[in-house]
Each structure stands twice: as structure tokens, then as C-alpha cells.
Amino acid sequence: MEKLLALIVVLVILLSLALFYLCNILWLRAVKIRKKLRRQGIRGPKPTFLYGNTKEIKRIRQELKFSQKQGTNNFISTLFPHFLLCRETYGPVFLYSTGALEILQVSHPDMVKDIGRWTPSELGKPNYLKKSRKALFGGGLFTENGDEWAYQRKIIAPEFFMDKIKGMIQLIEDATVTVLEAWEDMIDDVGGCREIVVDDYLRNLSADVIARACFGSSFTKGEEIFCKLRQLQKVIAQQDSFVGLSALWKYLPTKSNQEIQMLDEQVRLLILDVAKEQHHYQDSHNSLVNAIIDGAQDGRSAAEAEDFIVGNCKTIYFGGHESTAVTAIWCLMLLATHSEAMEVCRGRSTLDVDALRRLKIVTMVIQETLRLYPPASVMMQEALTDVKLGNIEVPRGTIVQVPRLMLHLDKEAWGADADEFRPDRFANGVAAACRAAHMYVPFGHGPRTCIGQNLAMAELKVVLARLLTKFAFSPSPRYRHSPAFRLTIEPGFGLPLMVTKLP
């Protein structure tokens, strides 16, 4: 009897501790953060237990779902209407909740600038992202913080310096020629002009570049990896509404969680096979994968080394091709609807590194596309220690959110025509295009600026220059302008274009 009583006491204590822990992570910690910020005058909508403001956000989205005017480049009111409503109500700095997370949204220029001066050990990637996006990015450069982030960046960043990009230009050209020839054959079959849905072609092209340049293989060889990562992207994007409860949600045996686990394991095995094969050959074109494999041996166990390899390869595979592909897609959409800009862009038939630097108009088109349609809509960081942004003391554990779209469409920074496609605004560089350079952040801001931006820009220049020398583009009658958020901003119903072969 005494043993049974003792067991009951132990179970009650353990249950109490578990309940206290859950209460702390789901409510008390958020309450403490909220109180500290509200004492400093930061306001926001009142949250509810467990759900925060997520129910209200869903309601606002539903009510304003069809408020966007067709054809406009400002789609914030469609995808993120709660951002606009909260900013109008509470100002450029406000607080909202997704349950266990307190999110401080910052679009005030001075505070955005301040964010860039903090190190990744102080203001880093949120822990919830590391958990909720683990299947997509693993423990790679995208999600790591502190010393581990610095170590990974030291290994990977040199592979994307301009001297390395020079050796990738021909790879990009070869991948682009494959698309050119496919489109020419399709058009020749019908004579002169036909509708082509360009999305998959541009995604495959970008995937081919990453596969060749970073992993020494063709897209065909890595096709299964890219397809499964795309499937993961779609499933994970559907779970975003549960982000505040992600720490618990991911443990439930739901259909989507089971699909994520299955795809994650399949991608892991495929990446390890590719890495093992390419490391064996030690090919000069796949120095990145070799650098990752060598870096994984730094005092790690076999399992930790595999996690290191898989996480960073996932980051390169997905991050390296998806953002570039969707930017190329939006570039063609904007050029198709602005024929005068398309004509100005037509240029050389031979490209090298020096020629790329002289493609000023094409560069301006890419910069303007990245302003209007940045692949990632927000920058998310977590205060890993107490930090100060402007006059605001931001307590540890706060998620700091910078809405790229709102910065890029701010009329005070960009002028009254901020919603319009005007590549010439970048004629004299970013500094002259807007009031403050830190209001333009397509590749991030501060020490975590994207390491792959040189490759992305080189690829986009080659692809656009090549396509525009061969084809003219115009909108298809079937095109429906409906940007969608699926971890990246992409056309909701694809991009069908009328493609005409030039003489």
C-alpha cells in the first residue's frame, strides 16, 4: 500500500511538473514578454489562450480575401491583411501572438537598420523555425545560430565568392540552352507562337544549375531530391497556421506529419547517396559538397556528421534553386506585361563574367522584381538575449519580424510610384533608388545576408539575357494574377505566357 501511495505521489509530481512546463512554454513565457514590451508603449491585438491572434488573423484573411485589385503588384492586402490592419491601428512597430510565440513586427526604418548590427548569437534564427522547418532545411546554415552558424558559413561561403561564380557561367548557359531548345521545338510544332506554362521549366533549370555547380551532377540525377523537397515545401506551408503550437503539433500522428517524416527520410537517404558518390570522385566542379563533407568530420560522431551533411545539402538544394526560380518566373511575368522594358533588355548573344557586369538594364529589372516580389516575404529572427532596437528593449525569446513587402512598398522610402514596375529607379544603384539602403532587403540584412546572392544574380542575368534574345513574351489570356504564399511567394495558378520565337 505504501509503495502504491509513493508511486501515486511521484506520478502526481511528474504530472504537475509537466503541466507547469507546458503552461510556461504555452502561456507564462509569452505573458512575461508581452508585459515587458507593453510597459514600453508597444501595443497590439489582445491574444487568447493557446491560439494567440491566429483565429483573428484567419478571420481577417477570409474577409479581405478578394480585396486586391487584379493586376496590382501590391498584394499585401491579400496575403497578409493583418499586417496592414495592425500597422494602421498600432503603428510601424506592434506586437501580436501566434500562441506560444510573441512576434514584434518592425517596419520602422531606424529599427530595421538597428537589426543589422546584432550578431547571430544575439539575434538569430528562431528556434521554432529550426523545429518546424527541420525536414526542409535540417540543421544547416539557414537555421543554425552562434558558433555553429559561423563554422558552417566559413565552410560554405567561399564556394559562392565571385571567383568561383566565374567558373559556373558555362554551366548556367548549358542549363539554359536545354530550356531554349525545348521551347523552340514546342513553338516550331505549332508555328511561331504558343502558350507555355513556364514555371516548371524555370524550376528545373535552376535545379539543374545547383545540381551541376554545387553537387557535380545533372538535374536528372537530382530530380527525385528536388521533387521531394517541393512536396515537403507544400505540406509544411499548409501547417503554418499552427506555428504557435508547432512544438506540440509536430508530435501528433497526423497525415501531414507522417508524410513529412516519410519524405524527410527519403530525402536524407538520397542526399547521402549523392554526397558519397560525388566525394568519391573528388570532381573539381563539386567542391561545395566536398567542403561540406570535410567540414562534417570536425570532431562529430558518425550520426552528427550525417546530420551536418544532410542539413547543409538540403539548404543548398532548396534555398539555392527555389528562390532563384520564383524570381525568374516573376521577371518574365513583369516583362511580359511591360513590353517596352522587355525590348530594352534584349542584348548580347555571348556572355561571360565581364559581359554580365555590363548588363545594366537586365540587372535593374531583376532588382525591381526582387523589390516587388521578394521570394521570402518576411525576415524572422529571435532575440537569443535581451537586445535593443532603437529605444525599445526587446526581451529574450521575442520573435522579431521584418516584413520585406512592407519595406519594399513603403511610399515614404520609394516614392508615390512604389507599387509600380519601374526598373529605372535602380539606374544609379540601390542607395539612390530609395531613402535608405536597408529598406531594400531581398537577400536579407546584416551578418546573415544570403551567401548565394552572387550565384543567384549571375544565373538570373544569364537566363533572362538568353531567353530575351530568342523569344518575346506576352500574357496569356488564361493568366490569373494571384500571388500565393507557399514559404516563397509564387504565382498561385502558375504562369502561362504566350511565347513567340524571334526571327
From Swiss-Prot:
Instruction: State the InterPro entries in the record.
Output: Cyt_P450, Cyt_P450_CS, Cyt_P450_E_grp-I, Cyt_P450_sf, Cytochrome_P450_Monooxygen
Q: Which residues bind heme?
A: 450
Q: What is its EC number?
A: 1.14.-.-
Pfam families assigned to the protein according to its UniProt record, in alphabetical order: p450
> Which top-rank group of organisms is this from?
Eukaryota
User: What SUPFAM superfamilies does the entry give?
Assistant: Cytochrome P450
Cytoplasmic topological domain: 28-503
Q: Which GO terms describe its molecular function?
A: heme binding; iron ion binding; monooxygenase activity; oxidoreductase activity, acting on paired donors, with incorporation or reduction of molecular oxygen
Heme: present as a keyword of the record? yes
Q: Which UniProt keywords apply?
A: Heme, Iron, Membrane, Metal-binding, Monooxygenase, Oxidoreductase, Signal-anchor, Transmembrane, Transmembrane helix
| Keyword GTP-binding assigned | no
Q: Which residues lie on this side of the membrane: Lumenal?
A: 1-6
GO cellular component terms, alphabetically, are: membrane
Topology term for the membrane: Single-pass type III membrane protein
Please report which protein family the annotation says this sequence is part of.
Belongs to the cytochrome P450 family.
Functional description taken from the UniProt entry: Probably not involved in gibberellin metabolism since over-expression of CYP714C1 in a heterologous system does not induce semi-dwarfism.
Q: What is this protein called?
A: Cytochrome P450 714C1
UniProt organism field: Oryza sativa subsp. japonica
